[in-house]
């Protein structure tokens, strides 16, 4: 569900910058890998990675990549519709809806994704690996799994009032 229009103002946040080395015959080749999350704080978020010999260039490439991978996040008021547990690699992320006014209870990479998605109230727990790229991927995977009550009712062939 990627969006193509670049007219939307997207906020970007650098989650991680990693110095990577390739050993060649003549010595070591240094490059920088950047992980960036972009979002409009209104239900759309994406992440991207970029690699280059200079940090700003790696960030630019990552932002470009992130804009190509935007997803839509269903929300109920200021929180998510239901609890979700998602995995990617060794990372597991648990996202739970929270009451209005409780804020974003999330750490590091999860916080960046949740805030830029525009979710104001959520509780999260990172389990397993804490590698930033896998945490971000698991979080985005979890947000993709979210469904509104209307969607669930339609899939089951019943009305929303019968769902409860």
Swiss-Prot record:
Among NCBIfam families, the record links this protein to: rpsE_bact
Q: What does the record give as the function of this protein?
A: With S4 and S12 plays an important role in translational accuracy.
What name does this protein carry? Answer: Small ribosomal subunit protein uS5
UniProt cross-references to SUPFAM superfamilies, sorted A to Z: dsRNA-binding domain-like, Ribosomal protein S5 domain 2-like
Keyword Cytoplasm assigned to the entry: answer is no
The UniProt comment on domains reads: The N-terminal domain interacts with the head of the 30S subunit; the C-terminal domain interacts with the body and contacts protein S4. The interaction surface between S4 and S5 is involved in control of translational fidelity.
In the record, the note on similarity to other proteins reads: Belongs to the universal ribosomal protein uS5 family.
- Quaternary structure and interacting proteins, as annotated: Part of the 30S ribosomal subunit. Contacts proteins S4 and S8.
Name the GO terms of the biological process aspect.
Answer: translation
Report the source organism: Streptococcus gordonii (strain Challis / ATCC 35105 / BCRC 15272 / CH1 / DL1 / V288)
Q: GO cellular component annotations, sorted alphabetically? A: small ribosomal subunit
Q: Does the keyword Protein biosynthesis apply?
A: no
Which keywords does this chain's UniProt record carry? Ribonucleoprotein, Ribosomal protein, RNA-binding, rRNA-binding
Pfam families, sorted: Ribosomal_S5, Ribosomal_S5_C
Q: Which GO terms describe its molecular function?
A: rRNA binding; structural constituent of ribosome
Which segments constitute the S5 DRBM domain? 10-73
Q: Which InterPro entries match?
A: Ribosomal_Su5_D2-typ_SF, Ribosomal_uS5, Ribosomal_uS5_bac-type, Ribosomal_uS5_C, Ribosomal_uS5_N, Ribosomal_uS5_N_CS, Ribsml_uS5_D2-typ_fold_subgr
């Amino acid at each position: 569900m990627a969006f193509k229009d670049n007219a939307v103002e997207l906020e970007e946040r650098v989650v991680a910058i990693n110095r990577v080395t390739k050993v060649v015959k003549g010595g070591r080749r240094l490059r920088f890998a950047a992980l960036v999350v972009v979002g409009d704080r209104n239900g759309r978020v994406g992440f991207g990675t970029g690699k280059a010999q200079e940090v700003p260039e790696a960030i630019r490439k990552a932002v470009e990549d992130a804009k190509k991978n935007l997803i839509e996040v269903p929300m109920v008021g200021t929180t998510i519709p239901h609890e979700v547990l998602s995995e990617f690699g060794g990372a597991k992320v648990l996202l739970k809806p929270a009451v209005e006014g409780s804020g974003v209870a999330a750490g590091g990479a999860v916080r960046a994704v949740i805030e830029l998605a525009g979710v104001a109230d959520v509780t999260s727990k990172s389990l397993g690996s804490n590698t930033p790229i896998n945490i971000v991927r698991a979080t985005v995977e979890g947000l993709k799994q979210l469904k509104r009550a209307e969607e669930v009712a339609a899939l089951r062939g019943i009305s929303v009032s019968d769902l409860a």
